[in-house]
Amino acid sequence: MVFLKRFRAYGFKSYADEITINFTHSMTGIVGPNGSGKSNVVDALKWVLGERSMKHLRSKSGDDMIFFGSKDKPASKLAEVELTFDNSQKLLHDPRPEISVMRRIYRGSGQSEYYINGELVTLKEISGIFADIGLEKGSLGIISQGSVSWFVEAKPEERRKIFEDASGIGRYTKRKEEVTNQLARTVQNLKQVSIVLNELKKDLKKLTIQADKAQRFVKLKEELKELELSVLVADYLKSQGELDRFNHQIGYIEQDFKLHEPQLQLLEDQLNIFNQRFRDADEQSIKLQQELQAVYQTINELEQRKAVIDVQLKNELSKKDEKHKIQALKKLIRVDQAQLESLQAQVLKTTSEITLLTNELSTVQTELDTTKLNLNQNSAALVYQQAQQEFLKAQNEEWVKTNPAHVLVKNVKALTGLLNTLNTFLKFEKQYEKALLKALGKSIGYLVVNNNLAALKAIDFLLTNQIGQVTFLPIDDIAFDTKIAPEHMEILQQLDGFLGVGSDHVSCDESLQPIVNALLGQVIIASDLQAALKLSSYTYKLYRVVTLNGETVYAGGIIQGGYVKDNLSLYNLQEKLASSEANITQLEHNEKQLRTNLTSLETKLNELNKKLKYEEILLEKFNERVNHTNKAILSYKIEYEQLTNESFDGTPHSFDETRLVESLNRAWAERDELNSQLKLNQELKETLAKSIKLAEAKTADLRALLDEQRSQLVLAREGKIRFENTIHNITDKINGGYKLTMEFAIANYNKPIKLSTMQAQNKIARMQSQLDEMGPINLESIAEIADKQKRFDDINGEYESLQTAIKDLQTAIGEIDELACKEFDELIQKVNAELPKTFNYLFGGGSCQIRYTDTDNVLLSGIEVFANPPGKNVANLMLLSGGEKTLVALSVLFSILRVSAFPLVILDEAESALDPANVERFANIIGNSSNNTQFLIITHRQGTMMKCDMLLGAAMQTKGVTKTFAVSLEKAEQYISKDKQN
């Protein structure tokens, strides 16, 4: 049979060039001169199959396996040998029909690589495949002159190895070794498990005590938590109720303040005006009295002078002289005419003054009506703004209550790394607000945090408190900074309707810019929908485009548009609240100003009416005096015409008399005017005095009311602060101490408490004291004891399994020993049956037998050989000659081969010590065995070469480099002859 199909070597020892030997016969001889490298085939085969002893490979180090170099050939960097076996009969422990084994070593590394059919493997895998085929170290598969001598000289225990390989019990030996090692490991594991088990028992006992204590602690702690949270929630709700009451009271008082403070200011302003006007009127009275005194003095002087003139005129009239009477009448007419002209001038002046006052009254009345209208409109606007503010506050409070992000922000003391919702950090250009809000969508309410760790803690808080879901924007961990591609931006900048990128129209802190870029960096702003469609098309519909009106063209081409109710957004809610408050402040200021203007106009209107009334009275008096003077003039003219029978010619009177009358008329008019003004001024003072008294009373009442309200407000605010502090402390305790939100605590711990507040506090103190007295608590022991018990059960199960495994392994060892003993003994018996035939053939007679050195222990017994060549009876093989020793060894070895055929046997000059006749017998035995065994024979002997099916020659045509080639018997004999001559 042919088992080894192919031998390939490169760089191994003297095989500098790659050589390949294909084996086609079952008996192949390798011949060549000494030093030609023919035995390197044996070394190569040993090396591939895992030989590690450099001595057995005839080398000192791994680098000696690699071609060292010669004069004509450089040293090789590596050595590799590959053996290909026919495994069609499944002789190897591998199902593949052909097995190729290769070993490679690199110069300087000292490490080998092993391959099976081109796949990198371990030496152990190769050893496993080639077990029990006789090619292992010390086995029968490789027989050299040295191994023949070794067989004879070896100790019985060492000699046993050949018989074990032949019997095939090596697999049992290895199996037993594995099982024994496994048993040893199992026993060791059992000891270790026993130690662990004992430790676990101690730990369990200790943990049981700790866990019992911990469970009592946890139960008491939970009861304390239940009671304390119930008390805290009750106090919170009670305090919240009181806080609401105080807030309502404060709101009511502040509302009254808003109403009464402007009224007080108005009253104080009016009082100041009244006082000032009263002082002005008082000063005016003094001035008028002084002026009136001077006028009276002037009138007295003028009347005295007129009286003198009148006496003179009357004296003339009383005279009988008609001429003098006529002259007197002329003078009287002239005087009265002068007085009439003066009175008529006064009438015209007064009429003009009345006209001016009437016009001014009309103007003031119009201004007053306008002011009233503005005041009404302002009041209506103020009411609307106040209602709008209440609505916005309600919206804000609703958002605060329902938004999980705000709940997190409220609990910043319990959580770190939270900042605020995104809307609080952004500012938009007004014209882009609608577009940007549309682009941001719900992300405007996302919660900004420092990093992922803060987000994870917040999410855990949300889960624990069952609050809801929040989307987080971690500043440090936003990894993407989206932008529009430069080539697309270049296109956009050339198109009409392109208003920029969303992120360009947002103001924010620099640290938040990556977030803004991530959300708006790829959002295009367009002027209108038509432009948006165009921009989307020119950028291949890769980006979202938003118009100033909020229409959207999404990436991919989806369009969204139409009427949308202008709802409040999270972004502008706070802005609108601030705007509403500013509007209310402005409207309140406007209302105060309008009321002040209204009071001033009403006062002015009253003054104008009084002046008008005064002027009308004065006009009436002037008209009466004009009528009286006209009648007097008419009477004088009639009398004059009766005396003269001619009409009055109107010749003017003397300058002095006329001027005197005019001065007197003016003085009387001034007196009357001053008297009227003085009377009006007195009436004004009386009116102002009443107004001042009334205003002072109202001011005092209102000031007293405000003082009372201030006191109430101080008390209410103190109460508010007190309950706010209580609520704050309770919230901090629940947030920080229990890691719960107030909402969750109210939902789960708002339970009736059967104890009074004092009793509950005392019970809490007692429970806390009990907890403190319990000392250190191992809370982990509760979970640990379950784990520890499980581990104990597992280890105990493992302990029992190991005990069972030990029994099973011991049983397996017994079974292995039994099988090995049986098969080994069968081999010994078969060899002893075959040995006499082989021995007689080689020796031509005599006897030979193998025996156990210890028949009671077949598996450990050595093997002794007893041989008696013809005519000799020896007790020790060492007494035989060298040739006899060789024949004895070969007799036993060939007998073994007949009984247990090996697939491959390598004979390395094993017959060198035999004479020609025995060489021939040696060769015949090999030839008879070649049907079941492939022989690779390295030989110098002609008798052996003649029996070989094929001869291969090994020669060094180039110094240091071995070449192999087929060779004839004649050529082989020439090699031998040359070798002998040398």
From Swiss-Prot:
Annotated GO biological process: chromosome condensation; chromosome segregation; DNA replication; sister chromatid cohesion
Limits of the SMC hinge domain: 416-535
Gene Ontology MF, one: DNA binding
Subcellular location: Cytoplasm
InterPro entries: P-loop_NTPase (IPR027417), RecF/RecN/SMC_N (IPR003395), SMC (IPR024704), SMC_hinge (IPR010935), SMC_hinge_sf (IPR036277), SMC_prok (IPR011890)
Family: Belongs to the SMC family.
Assembly notes: Homodimer.
Entry keyword set: ATP-binding, Coiled coil, Cytoplasm, DNA-binding, Nucleotide-binding
UniProt cross-references to PANTHER family, sorted A to Z: STRUCTURAL MAINTENANCE OF CHROMOSOMES PROTEIN 3
Coiled-coil parts of chain: 171-235, 263-377, 568-627, 669-713, 753-818
Binding site for ATP: P33, N34, G35, S36, G37, K38, S39, N40
KW Cytoplasm (keyword) present: yes
Protein name: Chromosome partition protein Smc
Organism: Mycoplasma pneumoniae (strain ATCC 29342 / M129 / Subtype 1)
Superkingdom, taxonomy of origin: Bacteria
Role this protein plays: Required for chromosome condensation and partitioning.
Domain comment as written in the entry: Contains large globular domains required for ATP hydrolysis at each terminus and a third globular domain forming a flexible SMC hinge near the middle of the molecule. These domains are separated by coiled-coil structures.
A GO cellular component annotation in the UniProt record: cytoplasm
